[in-house]
Amino acid sequence: MGAVFLSGRSGSGKTTFILNEIREKLRDEPLGKPIIFLVPDQMTFLMEYELSKTPDLGGTIRAQVYSFSRLAWRVLQHTGGMNRPFLTGTGIQMLLRRLIEEHKGEFKVYQNASDKSGFTEQVERMLTEFKRHCLPPQSIRDMMEGTGKSEYEDERILSDKLHDLYILYSKLEENLENQYVQSEDYLTLLAEQIPYAEEIRNAAVYVDGFHQFTPQEMSVLEQLMVHAEEITFSLTADKPFTANSPNDLHLFRMTGKAYYDLYQKAKELGLDPSEVRLEETKRHRHHPELQHLERYFDERPAKPYPGQTESLRIMQASNRRTEIEGIAREIHSLIRQGRFRLRDIAVIARNVEDYKDTIKEVFKDCELPFFIDGKESMQNHPLIELIRSTLDIIKGNWRYEAVFRCVKTELLFPEGQPKERLREQIDQLENYCIAYGIKGDRWTSKDPFVYRRYASLDEDFAKTDKEIETENMLNELKGWIVPPIHRLQKRLKKAETVREMAEAVYLYLEEADVPMKLEQERRLAEEGGRIAESRQHEQVWDAVIQLLDEFVEMMGTERISFALFQQMIETGLESLKFALIPPALDQVFIGNMDLSRMYGTKCTFLIGVNDGILPARPADDGVLSDEDREWLKRNGAQLAATGREQLLDENFLIYMTLSSPSEKLYVSYPIADSEGKTLLPSTVVKRLNELFPDSEEKMLIHEPEQLDDEAQLEFLVNKGIALSHLAGQLGIWTRQYAISDVWWSTYNFLMNEPDRIFSQNILSSLFFRNKVENLNRHVSRDLYGEHIQGSVSRMETFKACPFSHFASHGLKLKERQFFKLEAPDIGQLFHSALKLISDRLHELKLDWRDLTKAQCETLSSDAVERLAPKLQKEILLSSNRHHYVKQKLQKIIARVSGILSEHAKASGFAPVGIELGFGGKGPLPPMRFTLKNGCTMELVGRIDRVDKAESSKGLLLRIVDYKSSDKGLDLAEVYYGLALQMLTYLDLSITHSTDWLGMKASPAGVLYFHVHDPMIQASVPLGLDEIEKEIFKKFKMKGLLLGDQEAVKLMDTTLEQGRSNIISAGLKKDGSLRSDSDVVAEEDFHVLRRHIRRTFQQAGEEITDGKVSIEPYKLKDRTPCTYCSYRSFCQFDESLEENEYRILKPEKDSVILERLKKEDEADGDF
């Protein structure tokens, strides 16, 4: 038995030396004694490939490539030790989750942290570390007791941490003892079984690719030294460390220490170790710059390289995306030149997670095949989401978020139906559930979903055919979504043990045909050449079944709550990862600096070389802090590297990466992060500049215009990328700047290729202006017809912004409805409740002035109770919170009813019409217009309230409109067409008064009544009567009144002098109207009536002529865009030349009236 220690710097040919020696043995004796090639997990596939591609070998059965775990499986299969069930890390984490829940009450430090996400994984990592470093629970207890008596607080806190870890560690071992085995146990078992392994006893063992070893691995290597026929260790070091371990600042500290420990162990075992030192760095012999870098990287002071650097390039970029885009272009350039294959290229980062998403996106766009080394979480796979969301449905009482997370995995979709149609229907169902607040037993009830697109508080309409069709579709979806989940819910409720719970989940997946659906997806991915995706579908099902099996194996007969069951399943699912191997041989390798192993790499891109990232700052996010680890190490406990040791080893990892390529090295760094914050270059960049003072840094540019023509050609990676950059260049050209002829050639090529339609559509966006052309006559007629029936508010919308009108009434776009009570719903309730109360008073032959406070409360309560089931999908009946809101609304309506009663007592006006309809079946006809373009238009709607009074001058009519906000009448808004309702209602009432009331009426005014429950503020305490008076004042009606003393007194019979508490008017001592009264002459009302008719005529003609321009108004600081639903759709942007507000000048009422009179005179009779 002999031990050979092979050493050499990076690139000296150690791995090639071993491979050649193995090849020679295979050539000499193809079926000779076993050859074991022991390498890290990340290197097994690569070494197997290197051996298998040797052209003159008849086979490699004799030689096997192993990692430690694969060797353990092989040996234990032959010698025994595999009779206990194996628990994966997933199973361990699930078991730990249960132990944490059971014992967290005993914790001294981690009681609060135990409920946080990731805690179980951190504990599992810590306990794994204990095992790998051969520290049993008793050792942890001894350290705990040793620190617990310390006079220092930090050490006592460490003792408390060890106390909590000891509880979990000891309980875990109790659960595993003599029943299960975990991955870390296999190395211990391997070390025990090697003496009995026949294939080891005669084997030649080669160990390569490792930088250091855990105590567990050292125990295995010790047994291999004893029992293997020969063993060769290969370690990257500048010399054999036979007598002393290197000092802490030595570049090869990590590997040198491993060399020394192994060498000393070989001597202890009585072996005669020999050393082979490879002096020459063969990897870089044709590239002196790389040879210089490898040789002098760690020498101080730096030895400058005399000359240009063809094989080394330093690059900087504005951000990470630009960095990766530049690297992708460089890779394409290298491939086009024929110098490299994709498999010759590696992209290495200190932490590839920082770049993973960007690399995936950019390399996919650039059509660069790649493989990211490392395990990827299964969290985003549909099967994992199906299980998690289904359990969330059961836990959360069928909340819609969880339901649609589940449904959108598409694993519950029934077979044989087109997925596109189902997706569209699911979107409709989701909209329905959001709008109707569907949750809980509304899913599981046998009662079908009820769908109403149109609803009214005042009338019951029959369902339309479209509503019935939609309702049937919704219930059909419910019919296949609910049963499997509901069956699972029932089974879990009945389940008494973990086995029964796990079986319920398995049955759920089987009944939903999940295995068959995954197999179909796997086959489709395979047929489409998506090999990695195909393997994922295969692995995820196996992983879930193994998870359930382990769960049952560990706790099958135990009883646990559903909450703990879900927590443990969640913990298990979070730990599942895909074990991927490269799906193809020719692809770019993407890896982590510390974990990835490379061989035969010709070109390396080291990315993200920024300060704080490289060298990496040690992470201090475990359950033990770096100070804890330092203390334990000083007191004899051997654990993984401390933060200080990790920092010392960073230089070695950087050295290994920089020296990994044989021909070309690129080092790049961004100067800003994704948020624009400055990033500094790493000290590695400074070091490279010291070693290569003549090297020039290249700036990776996102846009090509700053480069010469030849460099711009690099941006033509493929058609898609070329088109993207061409669009940018043509955008520059449209701003009157010259662009390279490269882009005109690209333009000509794309415009003349067979598939040019796509390119034409993309490039047409360059000439886009956010300006809408008016519809032509035919389109307008098709959209609106030749007869328009609309409302006053529709005309106000058009006058506010024609495009908003087009979106809402032309395209009929609607926002997604939500199950919540909003201001329009409350306003609708107020209107309908007051109408019901008025109707009830009419039935009882009572007047408003006859009402008592008790009657107001009773009538209000009855009205709200009748309306609640009809309002917004029964929202007021949906929860205790909304029940409280309903009571508040009843209180407001009772308060308002009382005020209306008081108003009636002090008024000579009485209601003559409530919710008075005009047009349709209403008592008043619509307002009709014949438009100049031959179309017709009629306006229909309802008037909240019309009051009448007899005066010495005849019949007077006034309009009262109920508003849930405090509002007055601004004549500027009337003039610009933004507030037309009140005067329209007055015009209709006056115009048709003879037919309606039997006599001609005159206008008395228009008033807004604010429906609310006012809050009274006072500087001194007030009595109840004073409070009621103040409340009464808060209901003063604002608007515009007839400037006639008799009319004003009819509206407030209590008014003698001063301001009225009922209307916005007042009288002086001499009986004349106060100057601050909101009044106009009767003729002014007629001028206003004629103006609104002209406004409607103009709006109708513009609508039917196809006006759809984006022209929102701006009046003072008010614009319709503030609350517009279509803002993101119209994309109005004031910074664009073609987008500007239509500025409306605010004017005093007197100025507006004068202007209207002049316009009236100019137009003549309307």
Swiss-Prot record:
Record's keyword annotation contains Iron: yes
Gene3D superfamilies registered for this protein in UniProt: 3.90.320.10, 6.10.140.1030, P-loop containing nucleotide triphosphate hydrolases
SUPFAM superfamilies: P-loop containing nucleoside triphosphate hydrolases
InterPro entries given in the database record: ADDB_N, DNA_helicase_suAddB, DNA_helicase_UvrD-like_C, P-loop_NTPase, PDDEXK-like_dom_sf, PDDEXK_AddAB-type
S-adenosyl-L-methionine in keyword set: no
Positions of the UvrD-like helicase C-terminal domain: 279-586
Superkingdom of origin organism: Bacteria
Pfam family, one: ADDB_N
Gene Ontology biological process: double-strand break repair via homologous recombination
Cofactors, names only: Mg(2+); [4Fe-4S] cluster
Top-level EC class: hydrolase
Comment on bound cofactor: Binds 1 [4Fe-4S] cluster.
Annotated TM spans: none
Keywords in alphabetical order: 4Fe-4S, ATP-binding, DNA damage, DNA repair, DNA-binding, Exonuclease, Helicase, Hydrolase, Iron, Iron-sulfur, Metal-binding, Nuclease, Nucleotide-binding
Annotated residues for binding of [4Fe-4S] cluster: 801, 1121, 1124, 1130
GO molecular function, one term: helicase activity
Enzyme Commission (EC) number: 3.1.-.-
Segments forming domain UvrD-like helicase ATP-binding: 1-285
Similarity section: Belongs to the helicase family. AddB/RexB type 1 subfamily.
Subunit structure: Heterodimer of AddA and AddB.
Additional note from the record: Despite having conserved helicase domains, this subunit does not have helicase activity.
Protein task: The heterodimer acts as both an ATP-dependent DNA helicase and an ATP-dependent, dual-direction single-stranded exonuclease. Recognizes the chi site generating a DNA molecule suitable for the initiation of homologous recombination. The AddB subunit has 5' -> 3' nuclease activity but not helicase activity.
PANTHER family membership: RECBCD ENZYME SUBUNIT RECC
Protein name (Swiss-Prot/TrEMBL): ATP-dependent helicase/deoxyribonuclease subunit B
Source taxonomy: Bacteria, Bacillati, Bacillota, Bacilli, Bacillales
Gene assigned in the entry: addB
